[in-house]
Amino acid sequence: MSGTKTVAFFGASTGVGLSALKHTLAAGHQCIALCRNPSKLTAIFPTSTTPNLKLVQGNAHDVAAVSKCLVASNGQLVDEIISSLGAAMNSTMGMDQPNVCAKGMETLLAALAQLRKDGLTGRPHIVVVGTTGMSHFGRDCPLLMVPVYATMVKNPIKDKKISEGRLVDSGESYTIVHASMLTDGETNKKIRIGIEDPKQGRESMAIGYNISREDTGKWIADHLVLQLEGKYVQKIVVVTN
């Protein structure tokens, strides 16, 4: 797909999603971002200097709000969808929004189905951001990190597995990005890539401890938005340093 794309963002107020949004905007693409508090993004991307960003206030579990983000200016479905939804951990190591990803995916797929029923056409490529430590085909993280994923990140992983399973079974076009433990700060470190087919198994392996949120978002923009590389379509992609 060439030319200017319209890309919908969910969970782009911070972290990986924010980085992907920044680089997509900088490339001149039209972006629509759903956020509960639009002022978080207008503080970073002022309306006067970012005419290619449309903000929609709402919740990712509301079909009506999500639907508003999925319609491009031509009246058809957007070209791509980037979802980096996730729940913060509370003081007891629980999730502040249990099932946030699973509910978010259910809502997204329901919104797409309703819009198509209403006559809109298109097959957006859906990119979701997850974590290593949840492969069905063996260990995809350093051995020392296995206890961390099994305890501290157990509930978020359970939620993301449900979400990703729904996406894989949906028949939509997708790429699932599994980042190793996320750090802060843009770097020039080499990014290593592993590819896994969610139904057929692992094609290549990359095991590492961490990668920054900024670098992950930039990689998503470069390889899945600015140029959608076919080798990543219908695949799980591990990104790590």
Language model regions located:
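Mid/C-terminal beta-alpha module of Rossmann-like enzyme folds, strongest
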Residues: 15, 205-241
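N-terminal Rossmann-fold cofactor-binding loop
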Residues: 34-39, 59-60
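Glycine-/Pro-rich loop/turn segments that contact NAD(P) or position catalytic residues
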Residues: 92-189
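Structural motif
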Residues: 6, 79-80, 125
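Hydrophobic residues within alpha-helices
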Residues: 16-21, 108, 163, 220
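N-terminal Rossmann NAD(P)H-binding glycine-rich loop of SDR-like oxidoreductase domains
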Residues: 2-30
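A conserved pocket-lining segment of Rossmann-fold NAD(P)-dependent short-chain dehydrogenase/reductase
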Residues: 193-211
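NAD(P)H-binding glycine-rich loop region in Rossmannoid oxidoreductase-like domains
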Residues: 47-107, 111-114
